[in-house]
């Protein structure tokens, strides 16, 4: 369905684009043998050619009147500049040395000191010769094209843009519902969340309740004391044993986004491990975005247990057909991660009332982003319309609203993967409660959806209830 719309796709979105993701993927390229080092260095030499192909694609988009908004181009140009300006402090230098050290310690004698020095020199040369020039090339190409875009608004302003958005949403979320049905589903959930929050806030006039009321407007960090990611992951892995199926023993490494790149990467992300080595896992934390301990706790649930890391490792332990590891079902993976994140509020040391307030509030905010995505790209909202919508819900900071608007323009349907995927899991759960009655348990439901693995929701429904 999406094939006629190839030029509507955008490989260079902020946060999720190739320019952001490639360096991280390169820095996580594992060295198991000497040949892996050679292959990695060869990959570096291909970067200019790869970026040239992206620029050719952007030129074709421009000629068809489909180039990105000028402010999106400006943001990507600035990101590329900052990346190049890191020079010798760029993490592609340090991560290479670390990976050589890991190989040398894992396989004694496989790498001599002389070889390590030679490979390090070669890597240093290649970064300067291939990586930085590729980014310079991107800066130059995007600067030339930046004002050639015909549309600074949503997809519906492009020819057949609404039809494309319908296909895109179906592809990104795995949901077969129409946009109107999705809007209705989101509005219903937001109303439910707000009603529950209101009930918690007004249901008890005791001192406990008044402290909740004051706490929700203060930094969330006052509520949780634990700030060590490894201890939090350990806590989370212990909390899921009752309601989630067991998973194999694994090793997880916590890494941190380089400070100078914090603005350009997500608050945290899980690196999907090699298909034949799921025991080694990496989670990146972006301290620039995670400013309090509750956010850290719920984010580590989203990236770790019982979300991305757990789901990947558990599914791999079932030995699925390898093709399943290549197929991309963002609605399932991000929906499951959001469902898990929402559940994690109740795994924390918060009181039940506090957990309910923060979880429902988080759900509402994500729901508003999802409605704004559909409003902007399907109903044609401009910035003023989006601002009016957010103002209705008490979000009045115009700079924040503009940032949200710009992100939604640059990456259509991205928020829907998370929120609609989450709502589809909630709908599946309601169906399971109705169909299984007294035989429903959290464990049975979780095992059923995890055993099916990433797929569209109509397929999951079919297999869970067959």
Model-derived segments and spans:
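N-terminal maturation segment of proteins
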Residues: 1-466
């Amino acid at each position: 369905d999406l094939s006629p719309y190839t030029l509507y796709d955008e490989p260079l979105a902020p946060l999720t684009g190739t320019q952001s993701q490639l360096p991280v993927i390169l820095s996580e390229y594992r060295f198991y043998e000497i040949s892996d080092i050679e292959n990695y260095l060869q990959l570096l030499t291909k970067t200019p050619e790869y970026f040239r192909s992206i620029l050719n694609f952007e030129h074709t988009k421009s000629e068809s009147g489909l180039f990105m908004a000028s402010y999106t181009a400006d943001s990507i140009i600035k990101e590329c500049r900052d990346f190049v300006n890191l020079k010798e402090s760029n993490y592609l230098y340090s991560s290479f040395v670390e990976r050589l050290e890991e190989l040398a310690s894992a396989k004694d004698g496989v790498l001599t000191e002389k070889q390590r020095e030679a490979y390090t020199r070669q890597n240093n040369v290649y970064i300067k010769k291939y990586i930085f020039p590729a980014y310079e090339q991107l800066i130059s190409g995007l600067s030339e094209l930046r004002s050639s875009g015909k549309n600074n608004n949503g997809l519906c302003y492009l020819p057949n843009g609404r039809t494309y958005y319908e296909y895109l949403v179906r592809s990104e979320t795995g949901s077969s519902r129409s946009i109107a049905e999705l809007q209705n589903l989101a509005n219903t959930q937001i109303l439910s969340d707000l009603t529950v929050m209101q009930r918690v806030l007004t249901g008890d006039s005791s001192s406990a309740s008044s402290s909740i009321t004051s706490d929700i407007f203060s930094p969330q960090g006052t509520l949780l004391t634990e700030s060590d990611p490894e201890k939090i992951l350990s806590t989370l892995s212990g909390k899921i044993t009752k309601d989630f199926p067991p998973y194999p023993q694994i090793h997880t490494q916590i890494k941190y986004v380089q400070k100078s790149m914090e603005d350009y990467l997500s608050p945290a992300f899980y690196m999907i491990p090699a298909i034949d080595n799921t025991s080694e896992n990496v989670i990146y934390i972006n301290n620039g975005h995670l400013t309090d301990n509750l956010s850290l706790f719920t984010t580590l649930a989203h990236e770790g247990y019982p979300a991305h890391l757990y789901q990947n490792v558990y599914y791999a332990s079932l030995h699925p057909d390898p093709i399943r590891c290549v197929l991309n079902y963002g609605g399932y993976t991000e929906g499951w991660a959001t469902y898990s994140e929402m559940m994690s509020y109740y795994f924390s040391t918060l009181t039940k009332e506090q957990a309910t307030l923060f979880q429902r509030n988080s759900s509402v905010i994500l729901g508003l982003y999802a409605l704004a995505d559909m409003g902007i790209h399907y109903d044609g909202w401009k910035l003023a319309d989006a601002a009016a919508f957010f103002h209705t819900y008490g979000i009045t900071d115009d700079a924040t609203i503009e940032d949200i608007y710009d992100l939604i323009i640059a990456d259509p349907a991205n928020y829907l993967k998370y929120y609609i995927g989450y709502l589809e899991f909630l709908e599946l759960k309601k169906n399971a409660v109705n169909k299984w009655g007294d035989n429903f348990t959290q464990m049975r439901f979780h095992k059923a959806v995890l055993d099916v693995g990433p797929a569209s929701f109509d397929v999951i429904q079919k297999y869970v209830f067959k």
